[in-house]
Curated annotation (Swiss-Prot):
Keywords: Calcium, Chaperone, Endoplasmic reticulum, Glycoprotein, Metal-binding, Repeat, Signal. GO terms for cellular component: endoplasmic reticulum; endoplasmic reticulum lumen. Ca(2+) 5 binds at D254, N256, D258, R260, E265. Belongs to the CREC family. The lineage of its organism: Eukaryota, Metazoa, Chordata, Craniata, Vertebrata. This is Reticulocalbin-3. It comes from Rattus norvegicus. Interacts with PCSK6 (immature form including the propeptide); probably involved in the maturation and the secretion of PCSK6. Ca(2+) 2 binds at D126, D128, D130, R132, E137. Ca(2+) 6 binds at D290, D292, D294, R296, E301. Ca(2+) 3 binds at D176, D178, D180, M182, E187. It is found in: Endoplasmic reticulum lumen.
Length: 328
């Protein structure tokens, strides 16, 4: 039925967007395949020109940063003061904000969108409301309910969807560490955001290999790598950026210089060693605000530099406030 096809396609698109799965339509330079972890902000880090939006989103989270942009400077500073108290209370409650406490707060903010996305998925998938998400619940919520042997008989490209279903089940089994076919919230998070969990690394690599390894020899050849980035038209000259990608493949992707990528090289490419982004931002905020250079921040130091930490009507960029909260 057409309604089932439309609903299933919408669910798949929404969930696969949320999962951060490697996209078979990765754009130039292959950025869609590289998992850098959760970014602190998509805004440019441009403090030199008085643009503190990156810092605001790193410190508050994107949605809350928008809320602050609608406050008066006085309201913004008052709420920042309460955040400072919470940061110190979560640490050693000594009246100062240490580098570790600042980093912990930013890391907490960084993970908020993951928690929110998992909560939304949990509500969708836990159809019997028993506090767990079974594989059958997830499968039926995503793909629709079918009798055995009739899977996808009513949709176009049934074989593609059968492969997607098998791939999702394999990922679910890896995320389901206790093997009971019921996902806890932590296990569902691993299923939805595998790049955040070391034990999911192999499945991310396997899925990437399956997408790129067209001749099924277990490796990614340079032409397979390029084909994922660029589809040439007949007679079209290869763009300069594609030639640059070939060089990138040779110089930086193919670590053992055998002309192809094995599983470990694919893993190093799509899941590179990550920088501790919260620590980098915490050091930056500490450096910019620690006026007495004692290696920690007082509440007064933070409030005196409040426009770097948070925004207000005086520093906003014209965003419309889409939701309201009295407290964080």
């Amino acid at each position: 039925m057409m309604w089932r096809w439309t609903l299933m396609l919408l669910l798949l698109l929404l969930r696969h967007w949320a999962l951060g799965k490697p996209s078979p339509d990765a754009g130039p330079h292959g950025q869609d395949r590289v998992h850098h972890g959760t970014p602190l902000s998509e805004a440019p880090h441009d403090d030199a020109h008085g643009n503190f939006q990156y810092d605001h989103e790193a410190f508050l989270g994107r949605d809350v940063a928008k809320e602050f942009d609608q406050l008066t400077p006085e309201e913004s500073q008052a709420r920042l003061g309460r955040i400072v108290d919470r940061m110190d209370l979560a640490g050693d409650s000594d009246g100062w904000v240490s580098l570790a406490e600042l980093r912990a707060w930013i890391a907490h903010t960084q993970q908020r969108h993951i928690r929110d996305s998992v909560s939304a998925a949990w509500h969708t998938y836990d159809t019997d409301r028993d506090g767990r998400v079974g594989w059958e619940e997830l499968r039926n919520a995503t793909y629709g309910h079918y009798e055995p042997g009739e899977e996808f008989h009513d949709v176009e490209d049934a074989e593609t969807y059968k492969k997607m279903l098998a791939r999702d089940e394999r990922r679910f089994r890896v995320a389901d560490q206790d093997g009971d076919s019921m996902a806890t919230r932590e296990e569902l998070t691993a299923f939805l955001h595998p790049e955040e969990f070391p034990h999911m690394r192999d499945i991310v690599v396997a899925e990437t290999l399956e997408d790129l390894d067209k001749n099924k020899d277990g490796y990614v050849q340079v032409e397979e790598y390029i084909a994922d980035l660029y589809s040439a038209e007949p007679g079209e000259e290869e763009p300069a950026w594609v030639q640059t990608e070939r060089q990138q493949f040779r110089d930086f992707r193919d670590l053992n210089k055998d002309g192809r990528l094995d599983g470990s090289e694919v893993g190093y490419w799509v899941l590179p060693p990550s920088q501790d982004q919260p620590l980098v931002e915490a050091n930056h905020l500490l450096h910019e605000s620690d006026t007495d250079k004692d290696g920690r921040l007082s509440k007064a130091e933070i409030l005196s530099n409040w426009n770097m930490f948070v925004g207000s009507q005086a520093t906003n960029y014209g965003e419309d406030l889409t939701r309201h909260h009295d407290e964080l």
